[in-house]
Amino acid sequence: MPMWTRIALTAATLLTMSCKEVSNENPLEHALASENPLIRNVMDHLKEHEVQIRYTQIDRRNDSIVFTDFDFQVDAENYFYPASTAKFPAAVATLEKLNEIDSLDLNTRFYVEGDSVETTFAKCISEIFAVSDNAANNRLVEFLGQDDLNRRMLRRGVAPIRIAHRLSAPNADDVTTKPLVIYLNDSTTAVTESIINTPAKPLQLKYIKKGRAFYAEDSLQMAPFDFSLKNYYPIQAQSALLKRTIFPEAFPKEERFNLNQTQRDFLLEAMHTLPPQLGYDPEEFYDSYVKFFMFGDSTDPMPDHIKIYNKVGYAYGTLTDCAYIQDTQNQVDFMIVATILVNSDGIFNDDAYEYDEVGIPFLAQLGRELYQYELQRKR
């Protein structure tokens, strides 16, 4: 039997106490019922924001981990654009593929053919989590190919998922990857073969067309924006990957990613390391630059005893965060995966989104509400 044995529990079958342990309230509903204006600003106009949230309680019982999920409007059939959260699967799949190739490791130097930037796999993964670097992600997609990336996720139970394109790149949906020039040592290089992937088919989901208009280059098109060929990575899949990353032993062997201990330690370190710790300018890349829950609406330093292992995404007016939050001082840990649309004018690609005014403050306060609940929750 694994060290940790997963026990699947659904919120619907549980009697869960509120913060004061005096009622059977759903704690997520309790948080969303807050009178805080940062919460009310969204909850009072819920339909326009397409909110989906999964809050996961974590309990330890003898040698078992118990996950208890509480969902709000979570539905894999209701599409949202995952943006940079799709970099998380790319990072994990890259580590697993590296573990299968004897001549490569995290510190192997390489560059993409036609690109002047020489890097390492470790640097790409660090940049993905610290500042959500698009180019770093795209280099990993060239290494993997879309088909292999998706297969690796599905094989481990991370589903549904369909990563179809690179991010913020010309020909982002090109099905043929670019070769990588890899340094086998200081004087010897090898060139990988291009990978031909399966062309993406249009997604048949609700809310796949959004808004009332969009800009194509500099031209305003008076029609909903069509996301049917975009990446698809819903809340359920994001939660599944996060759980398998933080608590691999809670899953059967066939659902664990094949990472060695060095790789796993590196991944976890990358997920919680703050930008200034990697040498980024703290004025621009402050502690909570890509930590939306609890701290996203402040540029103040984050407390040392709270670590957030996460991946955010923001594009097309959609904010998403997938996070494991750990308070080592108070022995509290929990997970939140949430997404919100903030595009009040209904026009996409106009760069007029309410990220800072509505979206990030909502996610930050949601994190604070659930954190306060966790501090008082009986275990």
What are these regions (language model features)?
Residues N24-N36, E48-H49, S116-E255:
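Active-site-adjacent helix/loop patches that line small-molecule binding or acyl-intermediate pockets
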